[in-house]
Regions:
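Active-site loop segments of alpha/beta catalytic cores
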Residues: 1-36, 102, 108-110, 118-371
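Residue-level detector of functionally special positions within alpha-helical transmembrane segments
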Residues: 2, 46, 50, 78-79, ...
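Aromatic-residue-lined binding/catalytic grooves and analogous aromatic/hydrophobic interfacial grooves
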Residues: 57, 79, 256
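A contiguous, low-structure linker/loop signature
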Residues: 64-126, 148
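N-terminal capping/small domains of soluble enzymes
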Residues: 20-21, 33-38, 58, 84-90
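Segments that shape or occlude catalytic/ligand-binding pockets
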Residues: 35-71
C-alpha cells in the first residue's frame, strides 16, 4: 500500500496495512538525523524513517515548495521563496543558543499597539495579498512528492498567527476589551489564508490530503481562551477552513498543543477531522479516553511524549511507549504516529527519534493483537 492510500484509509476510520507516520523538526535536528542515517535529501530522510506524509513547508516549516512570489520588492521576499509564510507577514526570526545548540523563534509583534493602536491605523499596514503570488507552477512542484507520499498543505492559522502579529497578551486583551480591533486582525489573516490556500487547492487540490490549521488554544492545564471567545472568534473561521478543505475532499487537521479536552466537541462541530497532537503529559488528554469518546468522529496524531519520553527516556522506553500508544489508538484506523509535539527540538536524542519510527514500523502492522 502506498503512503497516500495508507493515510487516506486511516483518516476515513479504516485500517490500512500499517499505522502511517509523520514528523516535523527543527533544522538542526534534521541535519543531525541525516548525518546519522547517511542521507542527504529530505526525500531520502522520509524514506529512511518510513514517513508517510510530506509537508509542503518542509520538515522545519520554513518552506519546501510554494507559489512564486511576485509581490512588492520592498517586502524583501527573495526570488527563491518557497512557502515560508512568516516572511510574508513580516515576522522576523531570532536565533537562540542554549545547551542543546541553536534554535529559532519568531520575533513579535509586527503591528504592535504603540504603532497601530486603532483599526484606522491597522488599515494602513501592508497586509499580504494572494495576488502577490503566482500559483501556476504549484502543481508541478507537488506532483513528484504526491507520487510517493500523502501531502499536507500547511501554514494556515486563524488565531495563532494573529497573536504573532499583535503579541499574544495584547490580542487576548483585545478579544475582550477591543473586539473591533481583534476581529479586524483575525479577519485580515483568515481572509488572506483562505484566498492563498484556495488558489493552491484550485491548482492541485486533487493531490493534497491534509490541510493543516495551526492555532494553539491550550496551555499545559487548560484552555487559555474562553469558551465564549472560541465561539465568537474561532468557530466561524475554522468552519470556513473546513468548508474549503472538504470542497476538495481534503481532511482538516487542527493543531493545538496543551489540554484542549473541553474544546474537542466544538472542534468536531467546526468540521475538524484530525486533532494534532495528543500531548500525553497534560491532564485530560490520555489517549485511551480520547479514543473511546471521540475516535468514531475524529482522527488523531501524536501521542508519543515529547516532554518526557522522547527527550529523557531510553531507546527501550521509547519503543515501549510507541507500542502502548499504537495499541490504544490504532484499532479501527484514525491514527497517525507522531510525537506529542509535532516539531522535535534539539533536546531529543537522535537515537530516540529513530527508535520511535522503527517501533512504529514494527508494532503498527494490521491486523494486530489490539484489533
Amino acid at each position: 500500500m502506498i503512503s497516500r492510500d495508507r493515510v487516506r484509509a486511516t483518516l476515513n476510520q479504516q485500517e490500512p496495512d500499517r499505522v502511517p507516520m509523520m514528523m516535523s523538526a527543527s533544522g538542526w535536528v534534521i541535519k543531525r538525523l541525516k548525518q546519522r542515517l547517511g542521507v542527504e535529501t529530505d526525500r531520502d530522510l522520509h524514506r529512511a524513517l518510513h514517513l508517510d506524509v510530506f509537508d509542503t513547508r518542509g520538515f522545519d516549516y520554513k518552506g519546501a515548495i510554494g507559489p512564486k512570489y511576485i509581490g512588492p520588492e520592498e517586502i524583501g521576499i527573495p526570488s527563491d521563496w518557497r512557502g515560508d509564510l512568516f516572511k510574508v507577514f513580516g515576522y522576523h526570526e531570532e536565533i537562540i543558543e542554549n545547551a542543546y545548540g541553536k534554535s529559532s523563534a519568531m520575533g513579535m509583534p509586527c503591528v504592535g499597539v504603540d504603532e497601530y493602536p486603532t483599526v484606522a491605523e491597522l488599515e494602513t499596514y501592508r497586509w499580504p495579498q494572494a495576488d502577490w503570488f503566482d500559483f501556476s507552477e504549484i502543481r508541478s512542484q507537488i506532483e513528484p512528492w504526491a507520487d510517493e507520499f500523502a501531502i499536507a498543505c500547511t501554514g494556515c492559522s486563524v488565531f495563532q498567527h494573529p497573536t504573532l502579529y499583535r503579541g499574544i497578551e495584547q490580542l487576548l486583551l483585545e478579544l475582550h476589551a477591543e473586539r473591533e480591533i481583534a476581529t479586524f486582525i483575525i479577519d485580515k489573516v483568515t481572509d488572506f489564508y483562505l484566498d492563498y490556500f484556495g488558489r493552491i487547492f484550485e491548482e492541485a487540490g486533487d493531490l493534497i490530503d491534509i490541510f493543516r490549521l495551526a492555532d494553539d488554544i491550550g496551555a499545559q492545564n487548560n484552555l487559555f481562551i474562553s469558551p465564549s471567545n472560541l465561539d465568537e472568534y474561532l468557530a466561524p473561521r475554522v468552519r470556513r477552513c473546513a468548508d474549503l478543505a472538504h470542497r476538495y475532499d481534503i481532511k482538516l487537521l487542527f493543531h493545538t498543543d496543551g489540554n484542549v479536552r473541553k474544546a474537542i466537541p466544538d472542534m468536531i462541530e467546526w468540521g475538524v477531522d484530525i486533532l494534532d497532537p495528543i500531548q500525553p503529559e497534560v491532564p485530560d488528554m490520555d489517549a485511551e479516553t480520547l479514543k473511546r469518546e471521540f475516535g468514531d468522529r475524529l482522527s488523531f496524531s501524536g501521542g508519543v511524549g515529547a516532554q518526557e519520553i522522547l527527550p529523557r527516556g531510553s531507546v527501550e522506553d521509547v519503543r515501549a511507549e510507541v507500542q502502548r500508544v499504537i495499541d490504544i489508538l490504532a484499532p479501527g484506523g484514525g491514527y497517525i504516529l507522531a510525537p506529542g509535539h509535532p516539531s522535535l527540538q534539539m533536546d531529543v536524542p537522535t537515537e530516540n527519534i529513530i527508535a520511535m519510527f522503527e517501533a512504529g514500523l514494527e508494532y503498527g502492522r494490521y491486523p494486530s493483537d489490539c484489533t
